């Protein structure tokens, strides 16, 4: 990893930034095995084997900057926390940016749990936008609603979650670094732990906003 053991060093004098517009060895990644294919969405991306963690991406339609609102971010964090405490999802790393999020997770039914996560958060986030009177964003969410979605007035997330199977410890570390350095690469912060809405602080041994499974090696 770019930082020892995926951000294992301690960081001092931390300034926290927020989004703005513009298993021990037993938990290690299993050796590659025959894959069972499950369709994740209407895209060509699939969850190949639930024994492996997957790198996933969820994007707001039209890349709208919804997560500049702390209360919007909290809906996502609360949903992940609920799924973890219910034993339905294991979260290894995450980052939330102004219009999309990346995370690494595993589950016995990953396609289902990610689908439930997107459905629940979409409803809650639209409720939040309606209560806040965010008409401009809501109009765009309504305009971009997929034609086959006849059961709703808005579409919050783009179709699919682009799952990528993580089949080795090396790949896991690379994806964690990609997640944590995303705000740095975009020029929002100088250090991964300065970004409030990511698991970089968890991996640096500092208090994080939610729990993640850092003992995957």
Predicted ranges, named:
Residues 4-217:
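Short catalytic/metal-binding and nucleic-acid-binding patches
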């Amino acid at each position: 990893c770019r930082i020892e053991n995926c951000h294992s060093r301690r960081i001092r004098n931390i300034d926290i930034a927020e989004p703005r517009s513009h298993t021990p060895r037993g938990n290690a990644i299993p050796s590659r095995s025959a894959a069972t294919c499950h369709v994740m969405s209407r895209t060509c991306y699939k969850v190949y084997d639930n024994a492996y963690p997957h790198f996933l991406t969820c994007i707001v339609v039209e890349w709208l900057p919804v997560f500049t609102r702390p209360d919007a971010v909290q809906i996502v964090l609360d949903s992940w926390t609920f799924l973890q405490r219910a034993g339905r999802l294991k979260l290894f790393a995450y980052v939330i940016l102004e219009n999309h999020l990346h995370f690494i997770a595993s589950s016995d039914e990953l396609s289902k749990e990610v689908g439930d996560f997107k459905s629940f958060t979409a409803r809650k986030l639209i409720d939040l936008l309606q209560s806040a009177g965010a008409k401009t964003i809501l109009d765009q969410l309504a305009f971009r609603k997929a034609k086959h979605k006849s059961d709703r007035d808005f579409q919050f997330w783009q179709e699919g979650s682009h799952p990528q199977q993580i089949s080795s410890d090396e790949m896991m570390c690379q994806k964690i670094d990609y997640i944590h350095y995303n705000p740095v690469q975009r020029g929002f912060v100088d250090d991964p732990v300065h970004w409030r809405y990511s698991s970089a602080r968890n991996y640096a041994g500092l208090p994080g906003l939610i729990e993640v499974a850092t003992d995957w090696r």
